């Protein structure tokens, strides 16, 4: 009876916990140790944002060369603001603010 109670409690706790971002931190600034120098830190945006999938609207589906039933949409952790800096003769963008927005590497 005690073991059953413990198992039920664990199952209930697991069900109510937010498992959407396990293993991935929120989108935020993090110091880049490779390019940072003492007194001159360089930051970059890292972390996770949402993605979702939904049924493709009929109007959109008709316009597709290869119709797909499911459409997915994702956002990535990208720099909202940044300033150009030079570190060891390498031009970099030091991120100053992050947000979840269009994934640039998905654009063609």
UniProtKB/Swiss-Prot annotation:
- Range of residues in the leader sequence: 1-13
Q: Would you list which residues are glycosylated?
A: 69, 94
> What cystine linkages occur within this chain?
24-48, 27-77, 45-98, 49-100, 76-103
Which one Pfam family would you cite for this protein?
Hormone_6
Q: Name one GO biological process term.
A: positive regulation of steroid biosynthetic process
Query: Which key words tag this protein in UniProt?
Result: Disulfide bond, Glycoprotein, Hormone, Secreted, Signal
Chief location of this protein within or outside the cell: secreted
List the InterPro entries. Answer: Cystine-knot_cytokine, Glyco_hormone
Give the CC-aspect GO terms: extracellular space; follicle-stimulating hormone complex
Q: Where in the cell is it found?
A: Secreted
Q: Which GO terms describe its molecular function?
A: follicle-stimulating hormone activity
Q: How does it assemble?
A: Heterodimer of an alpha and a beta chain.
Summarize the protein's role: Involved in gametogenesis and steroidogenesis.
Give the family this protein belongs to, as stated in its UniProt record: Belongs to the glycoprotein hormones subunit alpha family.
What protein am I looking at?
Glycoprotein hormones alpha chain 1
Which organism's genome codes for this protein?
Oncorhynchus keta (Chum salmon)
């Amino acid at each position: 009876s005690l073991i059953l109670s413990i198992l039920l409690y664990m199952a209930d706790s697991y069900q109510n916990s937010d498992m959407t971002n396990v293993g991935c931190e929120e989108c935020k600034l993090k110091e880049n140790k490779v390019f940072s120098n003492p007194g001159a830190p360089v930051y970059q945006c890292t972390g996770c944002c949402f993605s979702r999938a939904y049924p493709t609207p009929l109007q959109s589906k008709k316009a597709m060369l290869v119709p797909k039933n499911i459409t997915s949409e994702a956002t990535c952790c990208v720099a909202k603001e940044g300033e150009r800096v030079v570190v060891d003769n390498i031009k970099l963008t030091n991120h100053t603010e992050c947000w979840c927005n269009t994934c640039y590497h998905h654009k063609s």
